[in-house]
């Protein structure tokens, strides 16, 4: 059952929170609350009663304890609203905005690790890491202003997945729904620094972290975590392969992934390629629309990093492999002379969905995991549903993120729409989501409609999740909209 705080209890919570963290950090202005009530997803809007912005672990702990006692629902938020519906609150609930907790607490250069708070953005982490000869792994769909910690916790697709894998967050500090502080892995032990590698930067956290991965704020608040950083190599080059056949795309992507050379890799259809490579100017929407028809069906983009002689060998190997299947390795994308420069810049400081949304006004994402070999049939099915609903294929973007498991990819299908086209998109989105599931898609981050689709088909899995939820959060205060089959969407 979803807990909904009564007006009296919410008012008492606001009073207690104001005393704990100061009036200026408890926001109740209607215009500000409205900003947090919706995003580009199809999740039903919900206006919070207030926004609280704690500045320390202790303040977060106090806020959670008050909410638990007064049965006031809390929705954690780290880096601004997203476009998947995960941070839309229960009506009259509370937004726990963690953006004031924006410090890089520690760094272990030798281990390639940094300890960060949830308010640290990718832009901030990248700038900090670069001073130490390191770099952060960045997300494909999210902007540089997103929270690094929550992105890694949510296992959102990263450009670097193809080489470095999905688990970038290691040990962490969690505040449970009753305010109890819990530390995973070696963070639970006393800290040991030089001459040894920082013990808290150890990548070994056991299986406990998996409880909070992709938990969508339903099982507590991650207030700090150690994340992996990667070296800045001597040579960094970007390369492209353009493809016009779905079946060839599978062969090309598989061969490149199998070689284990790319350090960052992504595949765009012509729509998302145009959105990605077009400069963000006042005429962005018009120029993007003009660019889409001129682009190849697919653009495979990746980086090669290392010493010069090593990169030269990798380039030669990939070019030879592609030549064997009738394709060329390109330095630029035809018709886009700045593609290399833009790709390298975006991998470091991504623009993400806020930029892409300027094409038509909004961008509704359908994210899933699937087998690389299923991409051709999934893409063909997608086109059929687009045509059935009278939606233009020039409005539907597809971005594929390869993983380090050759044959497994993350897909984002993006319905670029006008703000008022919610009802038009809803039926198309639902039918496509059902068909993708039938064809082998797995919704690892199920929000809104996707949660109902997944959990209703995996009752045993859902019951295990609910057992964990009832154990850790018996009062159901933490983001209660996320784990439900009955939410009015």
Region spans (language model):
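Conserved glycine-rich FAD pyrophosphate-binding loop
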Residues: 41-42, 46-47, 72, 79, ...
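General beta-strand structural signal in soluble alpha/beta enzymes
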Residues: 26-30, 53-54, 74-78, 96-98, ...
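Short amphipathic alpha-helix segments
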Residues: 248-284, 375-391, 425-432
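N-terminal flexible segment immediately upstream of the FAD-binding catalytic core
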Residues: 1-65, 82-112, 147-155, 275-278, ...
């Amino acid at each position: 059952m979803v807990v909904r705080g009564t007006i009296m209890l919410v008012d008492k919570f606001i009073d207690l929170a104001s005393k704990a963290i100061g009036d200026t950090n408890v926001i109740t202005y209607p215009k500000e609350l409205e900003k947090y009530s919706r995003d580009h997803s199809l999740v039903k809007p919900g206006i919070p009663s207030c926004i609280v912005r704690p500045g320390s672990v202790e303040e977060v702990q106090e806020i959670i304890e008050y909410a638990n006692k007064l049965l006031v629902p809390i929705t954690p938020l780290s880096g601004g609203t997203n476009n998947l519906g995960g941070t839309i609150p229960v009506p009259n609930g509370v937004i726990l905005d963690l953006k004031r907790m924006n410090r890089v607490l520690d760094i272990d250069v030798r281990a390639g690790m940094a300890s960060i708070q949830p308010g640290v953005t990718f832009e901030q982490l990248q700038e900090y890491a670069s001073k130490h000869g390191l770099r952060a792994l960045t997300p494909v769909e999210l902007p540089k202003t997103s929270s690094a910690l929550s992105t890694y916790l949510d296992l959102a697709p990263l450009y670097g997945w193809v080489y470095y894998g999905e688990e970038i967050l290691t040990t962490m500090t969690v505040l449970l729904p009753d305010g109890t502080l819990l530390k995973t892995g070696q963070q639970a032990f006393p800290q040991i620094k030089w001459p040894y590698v920082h013990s808290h930067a150890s990548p070994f956290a056991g299986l406990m972290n998996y409880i909070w991965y992709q938990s969508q704020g339903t099982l507590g608040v991650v207030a700090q975590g150690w994340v992996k950083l990667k070296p800045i190599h001597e040579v960094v080059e970007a390369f492209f392969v353009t493809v016009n056949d779905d079946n060839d795309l599978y062969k090309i992507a598989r061969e490149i992934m199998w070689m284990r050379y790319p350090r960052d890799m992504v595949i765009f259809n012509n729509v998302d390629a145009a959105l990605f490579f077009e400069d963000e100017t006042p005429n962005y929407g018009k120029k993007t629309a003009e660019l889409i028809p001129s682009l190849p069906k697919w653009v495979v983009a990746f980086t090669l990093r290392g010493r010069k002689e090593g990169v030269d060998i990798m380039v030669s190997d990939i070019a030879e492999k592609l030549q064997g299947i009738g394709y060329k390795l390109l330095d630029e994308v035809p018709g886009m002379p700045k593609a290399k420069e833009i790709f390298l810049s975006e991998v470091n400081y991504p623009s993400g969905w806020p930029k892409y949304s300027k094409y038509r006004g909004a961008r509704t994402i359908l994210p899933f995991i699937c087998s690389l070999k299923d991409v051709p049939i999934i893409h063909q099915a997608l086109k059929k549903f687009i045509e059935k609903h009278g939606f233009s294929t020039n409005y539907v973007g597809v971005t594929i993120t390869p993983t380090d498991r050759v044959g497994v990819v993350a897909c984002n299908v993006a319905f670029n729409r006008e703000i008022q086209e919610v009802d038009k998109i809803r039926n198309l989105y639902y039918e496509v989501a059902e068909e993708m599931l039938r064809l082998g898609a797995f919704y690892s981050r199920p929000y809104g409609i996707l949660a109902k689709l997944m959990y209703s088909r995996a009752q045993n899995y859902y019951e295990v999740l609910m057992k964990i939820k009832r154990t850790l959060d018996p009062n159901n205060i933490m983001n209660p909209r996320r784990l439900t089959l009955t939410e009015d969407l």
